[in-house]
Regions:
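Short, solvent-exposed loop/edge-beta patches enriched in aromatic
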Residues: 15, 45-51, 61-62, 119-121
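N-acyltransferase acceptor-side catalytic subdomain
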Residues: 21, 35, 46, 72-76, ...
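Segments that shape or occlude catalytic/ligand-binding pockets
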Residues: 26-59
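An N-terminal domain-start capping segment
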Residues: 35-45, 85-99, 129-140
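Residue-level "edge-of-site" marker
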Residues: 56, 80, 188
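A contiguous, low-structure linker/loop signature
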Residues: 60-107, 119-124
Length: 193
């Protein structure tokens, strides 16, 4: 049984000969583990059953500040060095006038997936869209403003969510040309019931 088969069986609540797992680290924790293990490639020795591919593009615009492909600038100079805190407001008004979705680097997505498949053929392949809907919307507008717009400007929120959804569908169309086993959406919304 391959690791891919073990994960698929576990998802279907079927017994497996071992318990599938996947380990991920924040960047500071990753660096701490590299130092602790005295091995820069320690992650490759963990035996994770899952490979996750995520298209993201951050560039440092000043020390500790990173801009994503939507134009959101994340302050990673404080305690949160992994994701950061939004330090700008791309959509400061409830209007999409002048707002353009970022281009999708199809070649980069294909390279990411193909390289992952080549190096991890027996693992469960997961394509991830982090900040998929609600998180992308609040990162563009600001949390408080987006929540207010949901009540005061619902047509704007619908239009914004439609554009984000269309963008994500373009990402999915590319990813689903490959034999990915799962799509992971990174929104933190839901309930415990």
């Amino acid at each position: 049984m391959t690791n891919k088969e073990r994960v698929a069986k576990a998802i279907r609540h079927m017994n497996t000969d071992s318990t599938p797992y996947s380990v991920h680290f924040t960047q500071p924790a990753y660096e701490t583990m590299q130092s602790f293990c005295r091995n820069p490639d320690f992650y490759d020795t963990l035996g994770s059953y899952i490979c996750m591919y995520e298209y993201s593009d951050f560039r440092e615009v000043k020390p500790g500040y990173f801009q994503d492909h939507f134009g959101v600038v994340w302050n990673r100079s404080g305690a949160d060095k992994d994701i950061g805190i939004v330090s700008n407001q791309v959509l400061s008004q409830p209007s999409l006038k002048g707002f353009v979705l970022p281009p999708i680097d199809e070649r980069a997505i294909r390279r990411l997936i193909e390289d992952g498949f080549r190096s991890n053929p027996d693992k469960f392949n997961l394509y991830c869209i982090g900040f998929s809907m609600f998180e992308r919307a609040w990162s563009l507008c600001g949390m408080e403003d987006l929540l207010a717009y949901m009540v005061l400007e619902p047509s704007f929120v619908h239009e914004l969510m439609d554009q984000i959804a269309e963008y994500n569908l373009c990402l999915l169309k590319i990813a689903l040309e490959y034999d990915v086993d799962c799509i992971h959406f990174g929104d933190d919304w839901g309930q415990q019931k």
